[in-house]
A protein has these predicted regions:
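Metal- and O2-centered redox machinery and metal/ROS homeostasis
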Residues: 1-242
Length: 242
């Protein structure tokens, strides 16, 4: 059920353009990272507090591997004075409120709405986000240096991505089985779609997405070219013989 929702609801074009646009400048990347920091902090705080039989076992099993807010705080510190210098924007605040509302409803009825939010963000990170670390460094060097962005690094869990994703799918299915009714399962699906809409709002809030994405792509190309120029030059045959 959730897998089909992912395919139908995931606006890959907007996600891709929004991510590319975040590479247009260090300042724009800082704003994007701050938005993700605020979103993940809200989501992980709600997951930490969750007692629903559909949510708590999932987070108990995977929270240590999936948690991103600590890494995002470090990434933000690389490019901004503090998170307080980038408070939540209106779109980010709306997203945070939706997450908190989902957690409150789950607390009331034992539902699994928070699973929908976790599904949206963590699968995006595992399926695509891990491949964005190097492009981010190329585009924004030297402000974003080696070993960063940290929030794309899932350690051993990410290194075994296929097996980890299969375990996550199994856990989500178990969460669905723990829900008491078809209506409760449908509420999770609706929350996934809501989470996607909030992500699109955050990714596009700053505007100029296409031009920002083009600038980000240009920064990436320039960064790759600079990296190649800095590589040690192999000696020509005549030089080696001299």
């Amino acid at each position: 059920m959730l897998d089909s929702t992912l395919r139908e609801g995931h606006d890959m074009k907007t996600f891709g353009l929004g991510t590319a646009a975040s590479l247009a400048s260090v300042e724009r990347y800082a704003r994007f990272t701050a938005a993700m920091y605020h979103v993940y902090t809200a989501m992980e705080s709600s997951l930490d507090a969750a007692k629903s039989p559909a949510v708590a076992p999932f987070w108990s099993s995977f929270g240590g591997d999936l948690r991103r807010s600590d890494a995002l705080a470090l990434d933000l510190a690389d490019v901004a004075a503090s998170s307080s210098s980038h408070p939540p924007t209106p779109a980010t605040r709306d997203y945070m409120r939706a997450i908190e509302a989902a957690g409150a409803k789950d607390e009331e009825d034992g539902g699994g709405r928070l699973i929908g939010h976790a599904y949206c963000r963590y699968f995006a990170d595992l399926m695509g986000g891990q491949f964005l670390a190097a492009p981010t460094r190329y585009a924004l060097s030297p402000a974003v240096g080696e070993g960063t962005p940290r929030h794309y690094d899932f350690g051993a869990f990410g290194a075994e991505r296929k097996a980890s994703v299969e375990r996550l799918y199994a856990s989500f299915n178990e969460a669905g089985d723990a829900l008491a009714s078809e209506a409760a399962r449908r509420a999770v699906v609706e929350e996934v779609l809501l989470a996607y809409r909030h992500n699109v709002a955050v990714y596009t809030e700053e505007g100029a997405v296409w031009s920002g994405a083009l600038r980000g792509a240009a920064n990436l190309a320039g960064g790759v070219a600079r990296a190649k120029l800095q590589m040690p030059r192999a000696a020509a045959p005549s030089e080696a013989a001299a």
